Amino acid sequence: MAKIVVGLSGGVDSAVSAYLLKKAGHNVIAVFMRNWDSSLNNDFLGKKNEKNFTICPQEQDWLDAKVVAKQLNIPIFRIDFIKEYWDEVFSDLILKYQSGLTPNPDILCNKNIKFKHFLDYAQKVHNADFIAMGHYAKTDNGNLYAGADSLKDQSYFLGQLSKSQLQKTIFPLGNLLKSEVRKIANELGLINAKKKDSTGICFIGERKFTDFLQNYIPAQPGNIIDISTKKVLGKHIGIMYFTIGQRKGFGLSGMKEPYFVVGHNLKEKILYVSPQSEKKWLESDSLMAKNANFLSENFRNLDNLSAKFRYRQEAIPIRIEKIQDNSFWISYQKYQAITPGQQVVIYHQNQVILAGEIALLFRNGKKLDYLD
């Protein structure tokens, strides 16, 4: 049987993953990753409910992971990737917010930390044959597939992994529903069987987003302007706090209908908005993506392709129009609020074949200037 290092987070998914691998007869080793230090990383503003904790949530996760490892009778170790996370995930996050983009830190977190540095560590220190994570996804010979639980499927976040990374990775929960995972944990009496799922920024956790970003990017107030009438409707606290399609949180009151964010002018610090009745400002029918990751050699010959532009979105039909170097162009029926900086992940049935970072959007052949 194989030697497998499991990323044990303190949550129920990784705990059940470790159990299933051990039950199958594998030599299982648990490793807890610590990738964020609030003191070192100047993380003071934006913490949620910190008065309710007698211990910081990350340290509680470590304690839970140790108890689970003891319950499963497997060894556990702890490794820090704090510098790597800052250099290869968080710095990019801040840079993109400063540029008016809406990044997804989970994409880089998976690519550079969980399935790069963690994999290297597992192979070099523990001589592991494979690593395993509690993601709801499937792998087969370097191919990536959506998980059986459509509500929990995390293949979207894994679209930038290489085939070599996927060949060394096991997802024990790929064929299970979340309810089945909870049931297994309850039957085993695991300490975290009823623990709430983790949310928020990868390895950082829940934060009050606006306050949290002010730790790293000074607030730069400016005008909120109706993109059609050019009328100033109010003031915003900083462009980086708002994403395309957002309809709450920018302080407009007394309006006849809801308004949406439809664009940014970084130089003039203008936040462009539009009323709900003018949805054309949010609509696109094609896009260009960069940083392409090709996970299938035969995708050019495939029909019935679909794409997701955000997590938990239902995939929509698309057509690949052009591929050039590390970029690709796709077309689709008009769709709203696709956001520069996010990932587009393309599927053939339930297999991920291609992913990239959304760079440009178009409507009727004309480029949409979401960012000036």
From Swiss-Prot:
GO terms for molecular function: ATP binding; tRNA binding; tRNA-uridine 2-sulfurtransferase activity. Residues 104-106 are annotated as: Interaction with target base in tRNA. Keywords: ATP-binding, Cytoplasm, Disulfide bond, Nucleotide-binding, RNA-binding, Transferase, tRNA processing, tRNA-binding. It catalyses: S-sulfanyl-L-cysteinyl-[protein] + uridine(34) in tRNA + AH2 + ATP = 2-thiouridine(34) in tRNA + L-cysteinyl-[protein] + A + AMP + diphosphate + H(+). Disulfide bonds join 109-202. Pfam families: tRNA_Me_trans, tRNA_Me_trans_C, tRNA_Me_trans_M. It comes from the Bacteria. It is found in: Cytoplasm. Its EC number is 2.8.1.13. It is an enzyme of class 2 (transferase). The keyword Cell cycle does not apply. InterPro entries: MnmA-like, MnmA-like_C, MnmA-like_central, MnmA-like_central_sf, Rossmann-like_a/b/a_fold. Residues 152-154, 310-311 are annotated as: Interaction with tRNA. Its main location: cytoplasm. SUPFAM superfamilies: Adenine nucleotide alpha hydrolases-like (SSF52402). The keyword tRNA-binding applies. The record marks 135, 342 as: Interaction with tRNA. GO terms for cellular component: cytoplasm. ATP binds at residues 7-14, 33, 134. Catalyzes the 2-thiolation of uridine at the wobble position (U34) of tRNA, leading to the formation of s(2)U34. This is tRNA-specific 2-thiouridylase MnmA.
